[in-house]
Structure formats: C-alpha cells, structure tokens
A protein has these predicted regions:
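Glycine-rich nucleophile elbow surrounding the catalytic serine of serine-hydrolase chemistry
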Residues: 130-134
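Bacterial N-terminal signal peptides
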Residues: 7-17
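Positively charged n-region of N-terminal signal peptides that target proteins for export
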Residues: 1-4
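Short, surface-exposed ligand- or partner-binding patches at beta-edge/loop junctions that are enriched
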Residues: 125
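Cys-dependent protein tyrosine phosphatase-like superfamily
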Residues: 20-122, 135-183
Length: 183
C-alpha cells in the first residue's frame, strides 16, 4: 500500500513537473528584439518596423494581431507585410497616419479596432515607434485605465513628442473629456 501511494505521488509529481516545464518554455516574446519596443501591458506592445523575419517570431510569441500605422513607402517597410502577417494566422490592420498631420479620426479608428477586434495580444508599429507609442499611450490612458504619468514615462523612454504630436495628444485627450496641458 505504501509502495502504491509512493508510486502514485511520484507519478503525479513527474506529470506536474512536465506541465510546468512546458509552460515555462512557452515563448512570451520577452526575447523578441523590436526597434524602440514598449510593452504598455502584456497585451499591448508598440515598436518600430519589424524586419520580415521578425513576424514569425511575433506570431510564435503569441501575438494575435499587428496594427501598422505608417505608410508602405517608408525606407524600411516590409513588402507585402499584410500577406506575411495573415499567412502566419494573425490579423493585420493598416491605419496609415500622416506624420505631419495626424488626425483625430486616425486615433478613433485605432481605438475602435482595439475595442472591437477582441482582447488578444497586439503589436502596434510604425517606422520608429513614434506614431505607435503615442497611440499606445493615448489608448492606455483613455481606455486601459493607465495613469497618465506612468504611460507617458513609457512613451518618453523612446521620444518626447514634437509640437505636432503634442498638439495631437491634447486634441485626442480633450475630445475624450480629459483635461490635458501639453508639455
């Protein structure tokens, strides 16, 4: 009886150890190297343009969708990014945002996509993570419950928005009922 009990306990322990080892070996994306990467939350990451080979790593890291905020003619753009991403089983959303004149409608489209496309893991990117970090900052503050200073600190870790983008931030905040004074 003691032998049966001991054998059963060892079998359970071995099974538990295997399950834990498999879970700890899952790719959470922590080693994924993306230009100017910001992890606003475990479900929202922003970055600069990934290389073509990075998209397979992004999929393996458990991302469900990619939102691209730049234009396809920038120097580091990946040709047919939409096809590459979709072939990997991820959603691809392209919201081209003019660098010199971001529009309130651009952010509203982004926020609507974030809210209606499920709660999966999302990578938002542009050319160098300036547009994307602003959108990530705004989304987290307005819809994600983040404190303004904490989200801003993350954005400022890669850049301080210029006058155009600071005015855009103020316009989006005001439109959403938040009193925000540009820097």
């Amino acid at each position: 009886m003691k032998t049966f009990f001991l054998t059963s306990m060892l079998s359970l322990w071995a099974a538990f150890t295997c399950v834990c080892a498999e879970a700890s070996n899952a790719d959470d994306g922590a080693d994924l190297r993306l230009l100017n990467r910001i992890d606003f939350t475990p479900l929202l990451t922003t970055s600069g343009q990934p290389a073509e080979a990075d998209f397979a790593l992004i999929a393996a890291a458990g991302y469900d969708r990619v939102i691209f905020l730049a234009f396809t003619n920038h120097p580091k753009a990946v040709g047919h990014e939409d096809h590459i991403v979709r072939e990997l089983g991820l959603q691809f959303i392209h919201i081209p945002v003019e660098w010199e004149s971001p529009k309130l409608s651009d952010f509203n489209t982004f926020a609507a996509v974030m809210q209606t496309q499920g709660s999966g893991r999302t990578l938002v990117h542009c050319e160098v993570n300036f547009r994307a970090s602003v959108f990530g900052f705004l989304y987290q503050v307005l819809f994600g419950g983040a404190e303004l200073d904490a989200a801003m600190s993350l954005m400022h870790s890669i850049w301080v928005p210029n006058d155009t983008w600071e005015a855009f931030i103020a316009r989006v905040m005001t439109d959403n009922g938040v009193d925000y004074q540009p820097l």
